[in-house]
């Protein structure tokens, strides 16, 4: 959720959530968004219901540690500068006018912690795992061992590629943490991954982390003793109609994604530059607006695909952005660039 309360409330409405349902929040509802304090309060209220379970994520753990461990006080300044462009620490920092330079870092830590006393008390007591029937819920993953409760806290909250590593349990393990798009080598896709063979479900749609993201809900229903999975999501991008046909011969897909954003520009063009990504050994054309330089190195701003989209007049597309003559769109679940002409935003 990452402080995106509007998106979370819209998702609950979309899935027709009621207090009779079981609701499980897999952590990381704080930081990165503009509504963090409001989100904490909303989640606090939800957690008072018997069928709501809220788990701790690495962001809740980090927030608690940063504000309650004196030895970490000096890290707050770096956190504000490099890690979080928004979130509750930054919000309270400005509310209390702590940017005037008159306080020590310990003093700043204490004042923010005092201001967020009730919120910190709530997140510091959140459980890390939840076993419910044949399901195990955890923020990031578990170690490959039967006694999963003895997994290290860093594994439970920060394991990066749990889907690739797998587990030894008979239970279905449901995780968030790593955006599902990171598991697709050549495609930007934020849909939930359901793998019955591996007994793993990954639900993180990248909200608060990726510019192309969605907030996912995994829906689990039991009918006549058989488990059924479905998914819904909220992705607040504007819809547009395509005004005229665009036919593009299908090209091979390449993708830039975390953590390999550094590229070498082979040939700079007027709109696109031919680039090489060393770690993935891929050559691809990147729209110039997505490239930037830092310390004499060239990087791609975010996840990027060089796939080009064909579309028919009247097709409905979601528009991520307009870059010169090209629209960066989602069409029939596929992300890519297209030379399409689009209408004004439309209701859908």
Regions found by a protein language model. Name each.
Residues 39-127:
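Active-site neighborhood of divalent metal-dependent phosphoester bond hydrolases
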Residues 273-278, 314, 327-331:
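SH3/SH3-like beta-barrel fold
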Residues 2-6, 31-34, 60-64, 176-185, ...:
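Active-site environment of divalent metal-dependent phosphoester hydrolases
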Residues 196-250:
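Binuclear metal-dependent phosphoesterase catalytic core
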Residues 1-42:
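N-terminal active-site segment of His-dependent metallophosphoesterases
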Residues 103-200, 207-211, 230-234:
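Acidic, His/Gly-enriched loop-helix segments that form or flank divalent-metal centers
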Residues 340-348:
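Residue-level detector of conserved catalytic or cofactor/ligand-binding positions
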